[in-house]
A protein has these predicted regions:
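C-terminal segment of N-terminal export signals and the immediately downstream linker at the start
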Residues: 15-17, 36-50
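N-terminal secretory signal peptides
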Residues: 1-18, 28-32
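Substrate-binding rim/cap in mid-to-C-terminal beta-strand-loop elements of soluble/periplasmic
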Residues: 344-388, 452-494, 508-515
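Active-site His/acidic residue clusters
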Residues: 161-170, 228-238, 257, 262-299, ...
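Active-site regions of oxyanion-processing enzymes, predominantly non-cytosolic
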Residues: 49, 143-154, 160-161, 247-280, ...
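Secreted, luminal/periplasmic, and some membrane-associated catalytic domains
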Residues: 85, 92, 115-136, 141, ...
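Short, structured active-site-proximal loop/turn typified by the sulfatase FGly-forming signature C/S-X-P-X-R
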Residues: 62-110, 149-153
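N-terminal export leaders
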Residues: 19-23
Length: 516
């Protein structure tokens, strides 16, 4: 008789019984936490792609509000999507930067959009990011078939244009009266359906409107009121633009564009919405606020309506949700940094080294957070590398700055932070020194409230990423992915090459293929 068979038939010792019980117990625990590997999805390009990009939206918004979500909005999207809660923008984290990174699949060091604005030495002026400042092509410029259409809904022409520079139509942007205009259409020549839509969303309908908590009965105490003062209409316009009413108008316009333009029926069409309201609100309140949470719940309701409506059309679609960046919490007053607190010590340090007793010399040309620009006409080319280091170290000696990197790559710190900083440098735009404030510190914006975006820290860099559609498996993937991965992944679904300068990877695990 085989010894193995004999051992298998032998009466177990007491210790063996204990070990077997332990193994069974461990197996039961493992089973409770076991998540099966999803079956591979067939990669199929549906005829309609909807991409929702919140200008500002942290991953923790989904977790802290999850129990308040209705079944058909974010809760459904999370359950039916390939969900990446830790998608990171590993560079400066401004809205224009995030949009450009999503569209191109690369970072500012290649696409050139280092911030919402930067200093332009040649014109001695602040330069706002514009579509033609993109140094590389975007995913949405790569569509080889002219019959396949692209539409964008955004707050401004420039934000819509960063997705597909050069588009002469199909881009909708908000006007101060809360109505939308379309690029390429003369005044009064907008599509008839847009005129009808705008009549239902005129700003005047929201004057003195109370912003009630989601689900609160009429007459409840409002979170705020959209007060209208004829002497200062811009204040009302700002309140409206950051409200759930404006956000809902954008989400409704997405449906209207799909319906009116018959998208996804006879061609492969894409509509992208850049949702700016929560970004505007976040810059006022920071990431933790009852207003932010209520706006998230409002977006949840709008998302549920959109998904239900898309289902009812009976046509296959895919939907992507992400954000251009996250947000810091509102800091104490002592964590707000004015430009003078940076420029003055830097100027003193540079003067001590290079003025050589002369007076009236200024070595700082401009400081546009987080970029410091030096006066090259007051420094020799051989002096510049040393001047940059002196400037960075002078800023580092203040209580506000955590570290820095110069345009020629010097940094006192070697870590993953350096990768984020290097990704943010683009010659001629990012200045001589990039400064990183300490975590929680923000740019002073003219009042003892509000926050600034743009830092390299995770609270600004980390956003959710969700893909729902026939090509994607449902599941949660907790490993870090990058914002540069979005364009290559969507290109793979479309059967197109990744954008020309894309450095991200195809998220093959979203197709059920495992991490590549």
């Amino acid at each position: 008789m085989s010894p193995i068979k004999t051992l298998n038939r032998a009466r177990p010792e007491a210790g063996d019984v204990s070990r077997r019980k332990l193994v069974k117990s461990l197996a039961a625990v493992a089973a409770a936490f076991y998540i099966p590997v999803p079956a591979r999805a067939a990669i199929v390009r549906p005829k309609l792609t909807v991409v929702l990009i919140a200008e500002q939206f942290r991953s923790d918004y989904l977790f802290r509000n999850f129990n308040a979500f209705n079944a058909g909005g974010f809760r459904r999207l999370i359950e039916e999507s390939a969900f990446f809660p830790d998608c990171r923008l590993l560079s400066t984290t401004f809205t224009s930067t995030g949009l450009a990174t999503i569209a191109t699949g690369c970072y500012p060091s290649l696409h050139g959009i280092v911030a919402n604005r930067w200093y332009e030495s040649a014109g001695n002026r602040l330069k706002a990011a514009e579509p033609f400042d993109l140094a590389v092509t975007t995913l949405f410029q790569q569509e080889p078939e002219p019959a396949n259409r692209f539409f964008a809904v955004a707050a401004t022409e420039s934000k819509a244009g960063l997705l597909k520079p050069g588009a002469v139509s199909g881009q909708f942007f908000r006007k101060p009266d809360n109505t939308f205009a379309t690029l390429g259409a003369a005044v009064g020549k907008e599509p008839e359906w847009l005129t009808v839509f705008n009549q239902a969303h005129l700003a005047g309908k929201f004057r003195d409107q109370p912003w009630l908590p989601r689900g609160a009965p009429p007459g409840s105490f409002p979170l705020r009121s959209l007060k209208y003062d004829a002497a200062k209409p811009e204040n009302f316009q700002a309140l409206l633009a950051s409200s759930p009413f404006a956000q809902s108008a954008q989400m409704q316009l997405v449906r209207e564009v799909v319906h009116a333009e018959n998208l996804g029926l006879n061609s492969f069409d894409t509509v992208v919405a850049v949702l700016d309201s929560i970004g505007k609100l976040g810059s006022e309140t920071g990431a933790v606020s009852p207003l932010i949470d209520d706006e998230v719940l409002s977006l949840d309701a709008d998302l549920a309506t959109l998904l239900e409506w898309l289902d009812a059309r009976g046509q296959p679609y895919q939907i992507v949700f992400t954000a251009a960046h996250g947000a810091p919490v509102e800091p104490p007053t002592t964590y707000r940094v004015s430009p003078d607190e940076i420029v003055e010590p830097v100027e003193r340090a540079l003067s001590a080294e290079f003025a050589k007793g002369k007076t009236g010399f200024h070595f700082v040309e401009a400081y546009v957070y987080p970029f410091l620009y030096l006066r090259h006409d007051h420094l020799t080319p051989s002096d510049l590398p040393r001047a940059r280091q002196i400037a960075g170290n002078a800023a580092l000696a203040t209580r506000h700055v955590s570290t820095f990197i110069t345009s020629d790559g010097y940094s006192p710190q070697f870590s993953e932070w350096n990768t984020r900083a290097r990704n943010s440098l683009y010659r001629g735009r990012s200045g001589d020194v990039l400064l990183a404030y300490r975590p929680g510190f923000v740019e002073f914006v003219g009042a003892d409230r509000g926050v600034s975006y743009g830092s390299l820290w995770n609270y600004d860099a980390q956003v959710p990423l969700l893909f729902k559609g026939p090509s994607f498996v449902a599941g949660r993937f907790d490993h870090i992915v990058e914002m540069t991965d979005i364009a290559p992944t969507l290109a793979a679904v479309a059967g197109m090459p990744a954008p020309a300068a894309a450095t991200g990877r195809v998220l093959s695990e979203a197709f059920g293929e495992g991490v590549s």
